Amino acid sequence: MLQKEVGAMNSVYVVGIGPGGRDQMTREAEAALERCSVIAGYTVYIDLIKDRYADKTFLTTPMTQEAKRCRMAFEEAQKGRDVCLVCSGDAGVYGMAGLMYEIKEAYPDVDIKVVPGITAATGGAAVLGAPLMHDFAVISLSDLLTPWEKIEAR
């Protein structure tokens, strides 16, 4: 499933590692992390997985350095290395997948493969015994990277 084809482009796997517990990481996410020689991510998320992948090279950035983190992942892939960029929850739900696709334009020789994960919303709902049903919607209330006025308008 995650095997590189002969002549394939260099790749960055944007990997959702789930809401935090090892048992909440998908098999596909684990396979990508095993396959890649470089794992990039937010320092806190790297700390969650570092002990399981001690033979890897880790690249970290602090909060609010998301664009820099993406560029680091692309630059490592350009060197011919398989790279995982990890995010909590699902890579496409408040994760790094969107930003990676935006920045990819500057790195046409690198392919992006998104590996989905269990979202914090669905993981939390399961813990609480509160299924998300009937027109479920998610709106982030974090104003760390989005102005509050934009959040209120949503």
Listing of model-derived features with the role each one plays in the protein:
Residues 2-113, 118, 123:
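Class I S-adenosyl-L-methionine
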